[in-house]
Amino acid sequence: MTETLTEIAEKYKDVAPNVNITYNFDSSGKLLTQISEGADCDLFISAAPKQMNAMDGSLIDDKDKNPDGLDLIVTDSRIDLLENKVTLAVPEGNPKGIESFDQLAELLKSGDVMLAIGNSDVPVGQYTEKIFAYYGLDEAALADSLTYGNNVKEVTTQVSEASADCGIIYATDACSAGLTVVDSATAEMCGQVIYPAAVLKGKKEEAAQAFLDYLQTADAMAVFESVGFSAAN
């Protein structure tokens, strides 16, 4: 989201010239940790509901969704902002000739591929775990065929540099990096990829809500859609 949100911040200057927007881009899991430890933040956009649920006070009685009992967001501000797709991307020239998730599953079983994936504590890694479960793949048994990234950007870089034969990344990251997407995971394989957003409790709730409202406008959505996002339904 680095590129899109940076562009949108520039556009927002025409709407609110006195508002200074500072971003902190990282994996959703790391951002959750930073916010829960007191990092200064007014608006949170997560790459999956899990990390948003973990700070949603309306779920404080649900220990599975909010295990630490955090109450950090303005609950009424929470929305499903964007939808992404989980894709199988390959380096330039696709040297391994990978064409689909079905084929990838067979290559993993034979140990004849190097796949880049996200760590289990970040959303892209969690979606990958669901894809493995769909194909009946044991991640631990595939250790010699897997290389990991701390976030989706690291996975994307491994594919771009051809240090892996392919990688499981978001459609938007593949688009931004100019990578070829050979297949997209279905909802049956890993569920929908929803990006929730919410204002955090604090002194700047009004300004944060105004920017969140702007993110839902046609102007902002056009930027998101240019790299493969769609508005969440």
Which functions belong to the PLM regions below?
Residues 1-16, 29, 33-36, 48-49, ...:
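Exported/periplasmic ABC-transporter solute-binding proteins
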Residues 21:
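Hydrophobic anchor at the start of a short beta-strand
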Residues 38-40:
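Charged, often glycine-rich, active-site loop that binds/positions anionic groups
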Residues 42-46:
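Periplasmic-binding protein-like
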Residues 64-66, 72:
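Conserved mixed alpha/beta catalytic, RNA-binding, or beta-rich assembly cores of soluble enzyme
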Residues 72-76, 81:
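Active-site acidic carboxylates
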